[in-house]
């Protein structure tokens, strides 16, 4: 696309487990320009999406069944490993053109686990410190009028938390971290009949 201002690849990476829904948002509206999708549309700008295939950018045909375009985002209703890659959004009219790419990684669960190590989040804490583990990147799955009903697991198993570990909204608060608190924490949310999971590895140091 000649004459297009190219912001290359945005720093935010999207991650999902196979079978989960995921929304890839056009980063232009969040980090690069001072306008939103509705305002851009009203001034005659068009938003187009492309999938990066090597050096080529192929226009995306939205099937609506598995993938649809919704305002400034692509909704993958049920992401698959083959969806991993780079997606470019282009905002343009006859005199203006700007684009940026977003990275999506979709991975299968590892055998016998509820997560894939490649798409874990990482948190660190020292022993005896207070630590809050959030359930990241869940904003797209929240209903405006209610707190999401999040369930937490450790090493993929339900756990009776000791008294100083408290679930606070969609986060888990460890009021005094112990060495045994290190490990993998998975938060789970039901959305339109599907499960959405995020796993955070907590590393505890002395």
Task: Label the model's feature ranges.
Residues 40, 86-110, 144-148, 184-206:
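Extracellular/luminal immunoglobulin-like beta-sandwich modules
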Residues 4-9, 110-121:
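Proline-enriched interdomain boundary motifs that mark the N-terminal boundary
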Residues 17-23, 27, 107, 125-130:
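Solvent-exposed, conformationally flexible loop/turn segments
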Residues 4, 26, 49, 74, ...:
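Disulfide-bonded cysteines in secreted/extracellular proteins and peptides
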Residues 2-5, 25-63, 134-162:
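N-terminal V-set
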